[in-house]
């Protein structure tokens, strides 16, 4: 019967122990032979390793040989270490995932290339351009429709800059202006008459004093005439602006209705 020499060392042994056992014997038999009846208590506080691998007590010695041709085995009895509550590995994985996500957000990978040799930045720009070109016709149609509806709404509603057609008020205004003009002229004539009377009583200096009064009357008449001309010009300009706005609105609608306008 072939035997196997086993060297056993560890924390529970003062010195290394060598034992010759049958190759078919188990590790439990080895521990019972070395430690006696207390081997069960020792196994609760320690475990066996062979070539940095944990060995179960029920395994046979011949199965530990493997491809080794050595005539002996080295087993180590290691003390068990109390573990923590666990979960530390999952915390590390979660922290690593957050770090990698943050790193990917901060890094600019546009200069990197894919397996086909195309830059990632070029691919991203092409994708954005295709999406923009796909949405552009719909946006253009929506803008044109909104503009057309706005013009139709302006035409349908009452214009805020409508013409002032109160003829009675205009006649009263013209009459008031003419009355003011007549009163002003009468006052000038009265002043000129009083001035001429005083100059006649003064003697030969009357002819010279009449001339400034006549000049002042002429200047006042010219100022009244210029004021009335400005009033008429402003009224005519308001009428012209109203006609221009109506023609411009109709022209814009004609451009929308006729697609060949301006070609």
From Swiss-Prot:
One CC-aspect GO term: post-mRNA release spliceosomal complex
Region (Disordered): 95-118, 137-158, 194-263
Start-end of Low complexity biased regions: 194-209, 219-230
Gene Ontology terms describing biological process: alternative mRNA splicing, via spliceosome; mRNA cis splicing, via spliceosome
Quaternary structure annotation from Swiss-Prot or TrEMBL: Interacts with cay1/cactin. Interacts with prp19. Interacts with cwf12. Interacts with cdc5.
Family: Belongs to the SDE2 family.
Protein's recorded name: Splicing regulator sde2
Naturally occurring in which organism (per UniProt): Schizosaccharomyces pombe (strain 972 / ATCC 24843) (Fission yeast)
Taxonomic classification: Eukaryota, Fungi, Dikarya, Ascomycota, Taphrinomycotina
């Amino acid at each position: 019967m072939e035997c196997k020499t086993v060297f056993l060392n560890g924390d529970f042994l003062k010195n290394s122990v060598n034992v010759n056992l049958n190759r078919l014997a188990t590790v439990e038999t080895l521990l019972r032979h070395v430690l006696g009846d207390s081997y069960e208590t020792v196994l609760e506080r320690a475990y066996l390793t062979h070539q940095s691998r944990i060995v179960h007590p029920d395994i046979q010695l011949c199965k530990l040989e493997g491809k080794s041709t050595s005539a002996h085995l080295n087993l180590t009895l290691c003390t068990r270490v109390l573990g923590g509550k666990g979960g530390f590995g999952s915390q590390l994985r979660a922290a690593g995932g957050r770090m990698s996500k943050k790193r990917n957000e901060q890094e600019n990978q546009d200069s990197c290339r894919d397996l086909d040799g195309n830059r990632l930045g070029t691919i991203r720009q092409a994708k954005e351009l295709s999406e923009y070109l796909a949405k552009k016709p719909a946006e253009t149609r929506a803008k044109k429709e909104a503009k057309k509806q706005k013009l139709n709404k302006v035409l349908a509603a009452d214009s805020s800059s409508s013409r002032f057609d109160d003829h009675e008020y205009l006649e009263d205004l013209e009459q008031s202006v003419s009355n003011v003009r007549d009163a002003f002229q009468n006052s000038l004539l009265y002043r000129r008459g009083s001035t001429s009377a005083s100059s006649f009583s003064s003697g030969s200096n009357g002819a010279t004093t009449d001339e400034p009064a006549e000049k002042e009357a002429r200047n006042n008449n010219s100022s009244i005439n210029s004021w009335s001309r400005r009033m008429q010009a402003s009224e005519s300009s308001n009428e012209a602006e109203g006609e221009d706005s109506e023609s411009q609105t109709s022209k814009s609608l004609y451009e929308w209705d006729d697609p060949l306008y301006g070609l």
